[in-house]
């Protein structure tokens, strides 16, 4: 899987159905396995960094337009 394949998908929290944010980076381990997604929660606030980490095991479904995650944000 390439970052470009998932980068433009909406990240949606299964807990409340709300969009969390956009993928800005991924963390990969030494074996090349994706460890987590780095999500920019509030991209319009230039004064406050609000990146969050979504662990790969929190991802429940990757669809055509949406990635569903189980996260307590």
Label every model-predicted segment.
Residues 1-73:
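Peripheral interaction segments used for macromolecular assembly
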């Amino acid at each position: 899987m390439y970052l470009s394949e998932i980068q433009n998908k909406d990240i949606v929290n299964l807990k409340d159905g709300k969009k969390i944010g956009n993928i800005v980076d991924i963390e990969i381990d030494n074996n090349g396995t994706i460890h987590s997604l780095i999500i920019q929660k509030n991209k319009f606030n230039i004064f406050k960094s609000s990146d969050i980490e979504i662990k790969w095991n929190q991802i429940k479904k990757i669809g055509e337009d949406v990635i569903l995650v189980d996260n307590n944000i």
